[in-house]
Amino acid sequence: DDVESRGLGDVYKRQVIFLKNILLIDFSRSHDMNKKVLLCSLLLSLPLVVSAAETIPLWPNGAPNKSTITEPETTNDKGAIFNVTNGRLEVNVPKNPNGKAIILIPGGGYGNLAMGTFNQSFIPYFLDQGFTTFVLKYRLPKGDPAIPLSDSLEAVKIVRSLFKKYNLHTVGVMGASAGGHLAAMTSVECSGDSCPDFSVLIYPNITMMQEESQPKSSCRNNLIGKDRSVKYDVAYSAYKHVDTKTPPAFLAVSAGDEYAGSLGSMLYTRAMVENARPVSLHVYPTGNHGWGIGKSEKFPDGDKFKDDLTAWLKDIK
């Protein structure tokens, strides 16, 4: 019963509930041997890779830029989290740690945190690869575009301060959609201990320039607003701030993405090349937007994406 208080991630809370229900089976009678065999099989099939998960607040003494959101935080039936005002990291430790950490940053167009694909796909994938995962539940902007970025920069600092505790030596950032934008901005706006060692940008909303943004995307309006001057578009277009210190990046996007588009990823890649920084861009012919790891009906190129990402991550020291 103390699992919830230890901050176990959503993916594994469901496992715990499942185990609690299984353990209610009456094994006291000898003819229940088949149930015992079934239980053992179920336990062996579960990806029990978590140890000592916890939740870490980003600003235990109060954030420097206060959110204007007053509504309570809520989660819908798809796992999307709304009205986030309490920035935090949720930690999951793999069964076979590789000494590397990754901060996972969900999307949601800066209007919510879309956790569905992360819970079902990205978190289990990185744990299986041996990464200690720190899921960033960042505060939503609602009129102040600096709020999410301050949370992500602080998150990198916090993870670095935990290297000894978790036996880590490297930390990267991974984001999808709006989370990809935030991961990219973290990579180009960081300094010192707030700088990640690498970035993984999945169908990222790289640009906030009006003429370069996808019409279907809500990122720009939710982050910057409709009426702000062009200086904000420039300030929050990540590719415009790439320099010779920007960390290595892996980018993946679908050619027909209607929400993030492939242009921003190409512009970021060009900026990395111009600054002689390591970069790997993968544009897939299928998938549109919102896919996860592995082949699916929505994303037939999913296995290729998984292989490309896995190979790239193996080169991270």
Task: Write out the residue ranges for each language-model feature.
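N-terminal cap/lid segment of alpha/beta-hydrolase-fold proteins
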Residues: 53-96
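Conserved alpha/beta-hydrolase "acid-adjacent" motif
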Residues: 258-264
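Primarily recognizes the serine-hydrolase "nucleophile elbow" in alpha/beta-hydrolase
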Residues: 154-215, 233
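Single conserved hydrophobic/aromatic residue that forms the stacking wall/gate
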Residues: 1-15
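Mobile cap/lid helix-loop segments that gate and shape the active-site cleft of serine hydrolases
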Residues: 76, 204-241, 247
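Short beta-strand/loop motif that positions the catalytic acidic residue
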Residues: 251-253
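Catalytic nucleophile-loop/oxyanion-hole region of alpha/beta-hydrolase
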Residues: 113-122, 134-170, 295-302
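Short beta-strand element of the alpha/beta-hydrolase
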Residues: 99-107
